[in-house]
Amino acid sequence: MTQSLPLLNGTEAYKLVTTQGLYDKTVKFYEKYLQLVHDKRVGTLTNSLITLKLVVDNSFKPLDVVNDKDWRAIVSSALVFSCTNIQHFRDLAAGETIQAYPNETNPIEIYLKDPNGYIIGITETKNAISIKPTLPKQSVEASLISSRSSRIDIASSGVSTDSSYPAIPKTAKAQKSIAVMTSGGDAPGMNANVRAIVRTAIFKGCNAFVVMEGYEGLVKGGPNYIKQVYWETVRNWSCEGGTNIGTARCKEFREREGRLLGALHLIEAGVDALIVCGGDGSLTGADLFRSEWPSLIRELLDQGRINKVQFDRYQHLNICGTVGSIDNDMSTTDATIGAYSALDRICQAIDYIEATANSHSRAFVVEVMGRNCGWLALLAGISTSADYILIPEKPASSREWQDQMCDIISKHRSRGKRTTIVIVAEGAISADLTPISSKDVHKVLVDRLGLDCRITTLGHVQRGGTAVAYDRILATLQGVEAVNAVLESTPDTPSPLIAINENKITRKPLVESVQLTKSVAEAIHSKDFKKAMQLRDSEFVEHLDNFMAINSADHIEPKLPEHTHMKIAIVNVGAPAGGMNSAVYSMATYCMSQGHKPYAIYNGWTGLTRHESVRSLNWKDLLGWQSRGGSEIGTNRHTPEEADIGLIAYYFQKYGFDGIIIVGGFEAFVSLHQLERARENYTAFRIPMVLIPATLSNNVPGTEYSLGSDTALNSLMQYCDIIKQSAASTRGRVFVVDVQGGNSGYLATHAAVAVGAQVSYVPEEGISLEQLTQDIENLTESFSEAEGRGKFGQLILKSTNASKVLTPEVLAEVITQEAEGHFDAKCAIPGHVQQGGLPSPIDRTRGTRFAIRAVGFIESQHKVLAAEANLDDDDFDFDTPKIIATASVLGVKGSDIVFSSIRQLYDFETELNKRTPKTIHWQSTRTIADHLVGRKKL
């Protein structure tokens, strides 16, 4: 590499401030990367064209420039040098954190940090604004690659990938070839996982391959089964169900000879890393493959099927697993790819069945999948408030389960319930391991209770259709993390499994996770059901306890002694959100099972102050609430101070409330703050108070997840899928979709990941004219490349508050004008459709979980305040940590459910003017959303 030009701005001398401790490192840096010669006498670094003067100042602090943002946007200036061979510089900088533009594979500019934090750039262009390299990097023929995607054959020709994709910091030390395969049973979301893996691998400067038809493709090998794929190959895959690269069971791979063939075919294709998306069986096979790899390639060498060069090149195979299974039966992860999509199908079917069951006062036995795992049956039971569930983890004797089921159903019927829903997992067993079939349950319901009963077996409907938003996003984030994992792996690193715990993507040891999963089945078969439950994650056990509590309600003796019984109220504040009714239903039924008396405040705070709209809740009135959308008890945006906080205190005292649960968005957050601050003046507020965040905006401080945001995300996703279909059918059309969310871009960002939107504009970033110009250029490039390749449409998602001037209508007109006839743009306004209809299973089950946690919080904090109840105002210390903690926000943070005091959140963690948290927890998701669609950020 040679520097053929001085600094681009014409400067030939420049001063750099450093410290004595960093002086030597700085010298070595510029000697290595810029080939400058150090003159110790005068402290300069020079060549024939430029001079850098090093100035030592020990008070100087090195610049702290973060790696996950575009350095060009952060620093005020950068030194940029011109060279004739940027590829040589890229190789020289292998192992350093760099940023390359427009992409790492064929960069025109490369930036890296010197030891002092200064940004140094290298470019092949002749001036600062040129986008053409000084010399051509390759012939035209070399840039033509396959691109057309198809379910049957992925290969085609004629499209260049030399497009300008955004760059992300380089992590790989050397280029790898990464293959992805799907194996075992198919699951919705697998295509999104493959798409993310392929595009992230290409970003990282790696070759991307797919293995067709699972392990069968490995065994058969050749270009028909192990195919190199490219950026545009996986276009729109996230919106499609099943797996486009096929999956199959393969007996041959279970034998060593089959694995030997698999190793040979991977080496022939040049693959040195494999990511497997499948269940525990598929992942077990993958890890066995890795452990045998050294002996397999040695055997291939001895047989003469590979040469010594290949043997030395492919010494190690890096393996990573992502879990694709609708059963959600993998230990160490809260959710597997496809599980929530299957749950959505089940809940939708039961919601439909409920209507016909109510008409005829019938009983329905619904059989769902789950051979060794009752997760689907359990969460479907909670989501639809089923009367009884049968799962393999908690069997009873043949007589016991019949008695228990008949007892609870007869109690429900005697109290006026017209419908009966019993959910049976396909692996349901009694304590002696005798299978329990749907027909067995049907017979008991008919013979013992005399019910008009029907059986519905959902079967493969549960696997079908496109993935829900959660699965698309989970699969995408896990795909990105899987590529990072294989690039960071060493021969000594255990094979990782990409998992999720609450809201956090994590890596777990693959072997241990699979072994734990198998241990559950072994424990069940050995009748050690207690161990089987212990091996399930804590969330599963919590869900089961919750189901039993809300299902029994007040039909049995309360769990708590009478002197501990309390009056607990619940109120909805803010805009309606999916899951609000689930929270009210679960809070009320759980209170009944504990012995507490639940109250509902109807129509928010103004309902209380204007009409004294307070009612105690009884079980029969709540029937069906778990699966209803909106807010059955009514809601509005008024805060206590707007409604009359003194009158609210009066009614609290009149009814003797011992605790209050507020369900809602930012208005509910402000309400909790006002009530907590009013404790000094009103003794009625010296009770435990807790907020359950519920808003589609997901903008409540103290939590990364709010009820209603998943329902809204699914509604918006379905709308966008339909709009995108229209855009693709019309050819050459962009739709600008207006997205709600206030000043939070959460909804727009996550919807962009789920539907593969080309651009998303959010309030946190706004819309600059420069970025809009760049985005229009990207769209023009996309449409020009797509010409002649079938249907192709694009989406732009714009948060309403991203710009008040550039409305969707204006944006569409500007884009159409700038497109100059190559394509056009239309606007689409989904409006309040985004609030959703029926709540999603995630919002239903989390609403239940949060509500029961909230009641538990009130039970524990009531003791703290009871000890201070008799103190005078002067003696009551409002500022002690234990008193402050009695008014809290329930939230999900990372992998934990936490309670954070409202005072801490309101005073230190909230942007009050913007109505958002100060910390944006989903910023990294934005980066991924942009780089997976090739968007350049300025």
From Swiss-Prot:
Binding site for ATP: 185, 249-250, 279-282
Keyword presence, Transferase: yes
Regulation: Allosterically activated by ADP, AMP, or fructose 2,6-bisphosphate, and allosterically inhibited by ATP or citrate.
Pathway(s) it belongs to: Carbohydrate degradation; glycolysis; D-glyceraldehyde 3-phosphate and glycerone phosphate from D-glucose: step 3/4
GO BP: canonical glycolysis; fructose 1,6-bisphosphate metabolic process; fructose 6-phosphate metabolic process
Origin: domain of life: Eukaryota
One protein family per Pfam: PFK
Name of the protein in its database record: ATP-dependent 6-phosphofructokinase subunit beta
Entries under PROSITE patterns matching the protein: PHOSPHOFRUCTOKINASE
Region (C-terminal regulatory PFK domain 2): 567-938
Gene Ontology molecular function terms on file: 6-phosphofructokinase activity; AMP binding; ATP binding; fructose-6-phosphate binding; identical protein binding; metal ion binding; monosaccharide binding
Residues at which beta-D-fructose 6-phosphate 2 binds: 325-327, 369-371, 426, 460-463
Function comment: Catalyzes the phosphorylation of D-fructose 6-phosphate to fructose 1,6-bisphosphate by ATP, the first committing step of glycolysis.
Matching InterPro entries: 6-Pfructokinase_euk, ATP_PFK, Glyas_Bleomycin-R_OHBP_Dase, PFK_vert-type, Phosphofructokinase_CS, Phosphofructokinase_dom, PKF_sf
